[in-house]
Amino acid sequence: MEAPGIVWVEESVSAITLYAVWLPPRTRDCLHALLYLVCRDAAGEARARFAEVSVGSSDLQDFYGSPDVSAPGAVAAARAATAPAASPLEPLGDPTLWRALYACVLAALERQTGRWALFVPLRLGWDPQTGLVVRVERASWGPPAAPRAALLDVEAKVDVDPLALSARVAEHPGARLAWARLAAIRDSPQCASSASLAVTITTRTARFAREYTTLAFPPTRKEGAFADLVEVCEVGLRPRGHPQRVTARVLLPRGYDYFVSAGDGFSAPALVALFRQWHTTVHAAPGALAPVFAFLGPGFEVRGGPVQYFAVLGFPGWPTFTVPAAAAAESARDLVRGAAATHAACLGAWPAVGARVVLPPRAWPAVASEAAGRLLPAFREAVARWHPTATTIQLLDPPAAVGPVWTARFCFSGLQAQLLAALAGLGEAGLPEARGRAGLERLDALVAAAPSEPWARAVLERLVPDACDACPALRQLLGGVMAAVCLQIEQTASSVKFAVCGGTGAAFWGLFNVDPGDADAAHGAIQDARRALEASVRAVLSANGIRPRLAPSLAPEGVYTHVVTWSQTGAWFWNSRDDTDFLQGFPLRGAAYAAAAEVMRDALRRILRRPAAGPPEEAVCAARGVMEDACDRFVLDAFGRRLDAEYWSVLTPPGEADDPLPQTAFRGGALLDAEQYWRRVVRVCPGGGESVGVPVDLYPRPLVLPPVDCAHHLREILREIQLVFTGVLEGVWGEGGSFVYPFDEKIRFLFP
């Protein structure tokens, strides 16, 4: 029975963002949030809708992960973010607070009005007295609405004092310069007002372009009208708990649902400056409640993050997706489709809020405890014994070399994510009421989509470790169950002529007791092993009440005749029949490392192809000759690239190579915006002292640098090669001595 006074409309929703946050009168432990819903009807016409939710301080603390946050504190931050002229980058102060607030408000929306979905037909029930959507249901009309893109190209010259950047980095060692730039702009917001800016936005029906020598003055170049791009819409509302009726003034996108920007040249300060200009222009006239102006992304974290994104939490009200500028056209389209699908599947909250898209951090311990209590004793014991430093399957202690013998690599693709979803379902009773059901259903949907959708796999690859980081008990549970699964794999393997020799998590490899010359028998044994291992894992999970939405599927990832291992993670697999190979555990940190890997793989082929006849001493001597020749070739080829800083540059994450940056690096302007996590460093010799690391991406092209310290880079790469070759000598011949390439004595003179 439908509630009286509610008007129902059938529309789809393309984005949900924060508009305003406040404390009701005489209340300190509960906040109210007004959400802006960008909708369109069956004819494609855009509509502005709003919904209101209430959030208690305890809910906010659950999503924050600690009691160090309150409703008044969140309201103060949101209120400050409505004035971008004075505070254009409020989330920089506490990005975790904004993640918690956004995730908490979305969860409250589903809890208080019904289950939402983006780009699918919905029945929205709104109250004419308040102007607010109060109920939502799935509609039956038509297929999902296809998301529509608008291409965004924006460049801005935001002059930031290099000394201010240097000061921010000095205060936070290891800080990424994208964050340092935003922090400096936050501290001096006037520099955003004086920025020069050029923007072009192309939709299916319009082209909008503006150029400003400074945002403090009108544009010097204009193409298209702002009204062709957006509609400025005012809606009168009477929110609950608000002392008076308010007017919301929003932008409605015309003919598109999101912006797409080229990621390689993407600049968060440029986009913030553009949106700040729009916010100032649209809300220059009085009479409307100013909306929240807040964003998240790796540039808002001191040490950044490996995934590039720009999350719009408030104004202008729809998302911006970034794709690599160098991506081929078809690849770029796939990336954009994946970004839109991720946005729809997670209500626009991924990756900004992380695992909070499923459950708040403080909800996972109860789920983990409930799930663990439902396991059989053997699994409970495995969970209790498991430790993060526990070794994985490792029958062959490195260094080792085997072959010719049939070996194969297998993987239960996506098993960890499937187990997380199944364990969460098993422990759902540990949640208070039904507060986590929508998030758990969302996790199930991601797991179901993962086999066919790369975007879903990408979400799960980051969601699982993020959830485990938020809850050590969940990490313990998932690690213990994975260990029990690995034990089941080992026990089953012996019955199918298979010995598991190594692996990590759901991926493992092993040897088959089959005639090395009988390829047909090997194929049959591999298929028998796959079926038996798959069935045994399914059975043991089912016996413990762990029922993944999709039955775990085991896939062979390669068949080989030789294996060389040199460390717990380093291994080279080779099939001498078709010359296919697979290398793991060798660092590919740059072009020079990749060249070294190719030379090394070629040398391993030459060594293993040599006949075993003759005294072992001669074989060892010949192998050492091949190894030294390989190193010679690599070093001589590298000599030809001695002036190429791009070739020698090495990719480093935060904390690995945090040498003091040269002061010239802080003068790179917008180039610094791209340093959001990784830093490519090359060692150069400025003269008069030791070599120093220079971040090559912070300087304009063509690079003008002191001579590259090739010897430094070569020693590091040769150290990795020597580790592999030493493993071959010990694994094949039991040779006790290590392989050491005489770089300094033999060829160092080439690199002064």
From Swiss-Prot:
Pfam families listed in its UniProt record: Herpes_HEPA
Cell compartment(s), UniProt: Host nucleus
Keywords assigned: DNA replication, Host nucleus
Top-level lineage group: Viruses
GO biological process entries: DNA replication; viral genome replication
One GO CC term on file: host cell nucleus
Subunit: Associates with the primase and the helicase to form the helicase-primase complex. Interacts with the origin-binding protein. Interacts with the polymerase catalytic subunit.
Family: Belongs to the herpesviridae HEPA family.
UniProt cross-references to HAMAP family, sorted A to Z: HSV_HEPA
Protein's job: Component of the helicase/primase complex. Unwinds the DNA at the replication forks and generates single-stranded DNA for both leading and lagging strand synthesis. The primase synthesizes short RNA primers on the lagging strand that the polymerase presumably elongates using dNTPs. The primase-associated factor has no known catalytic activity in the complex and may serve to facilitate the formation of the replisome by directly interacting with the origin-binding protein and the polymerase.
Name under which the protein is recorded: DNA helicase/primase complex-associated protein
